[in-house]
């Protein structure tokens, strides 16, 4: 417990809440350009080749974003929309690329959960 004198000298500081996606700067999504598209391996106990892209955002940040779904058409200089949301088994990946917008096409032949992957309703 601080004394009255200590509280007069320096007041109590409010607890600042830390954002989980600082590069978005409070926006729901941000546009960016892919600088590198590559695969990385997840941490233990999982095993795979997860597709990720290094993206330079309009806010000036350079981030690593996950490419969801099976198959993609992204390459260097592709313009993508990025949303928040981490990938639990990929350390440092705190963003997702939105499929079906800008240069990222939707997942082909997707039947369920189509809205999350930018897939149109099959005829």
Curated annotation (Swiss-Prot):
SUPFAM superfamilies: Nucleic acid-binding proteins. InterPro entries: NA-bd_OB-fold, Ribosomal_uS12, Ribosomal_uS12_bac. It is found in: Plastid, Chloroplast. One of its GO terms (biological process) is translation. One of its GO terms (molecular function) is rRNA binding. GO terms for cellular component: chloroplast; small ribosomal subunit. Belongs to the universal ribosomal protein uS12 family. With S4 and S5 plays an important role in translational accuracy. Located at the interface of the 30S and 50S subunits. NCBIfam families: rpsL_bact. Part of the 30S ribosomal subunit. This is Small ribosomal subunit protein uS12cz/uS12cy. It comes from Phaseolus vulgaris. The gene is rps12-A.
């Amino acid at each position: 417990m601080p004394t009255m004198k200590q509280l007069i000298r320096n007041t109590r500081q409010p607890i600042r809440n830390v954002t989980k996606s600082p590069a978005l700067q409070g926006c729901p999504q941000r546009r960016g350009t892919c600088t590198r598209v590559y695969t990385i391996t997840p941490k233990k106990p999982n095993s795979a080749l997860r597709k990720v892209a290094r993206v330079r955002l309009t806010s000036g940040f350079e981030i690593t974003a996950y490419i969801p779904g099976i198959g993609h058409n992204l390459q260097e200089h592709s313009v993508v929309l990025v949303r928040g949301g981490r990938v639990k088994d990929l350390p440092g990946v705190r963003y997702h690329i939105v499929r079906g917008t800008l240069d990222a096409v939707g997942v082909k032949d997707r039947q369920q959960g189509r809205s999350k992957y930018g897939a149109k309703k099959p005829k």
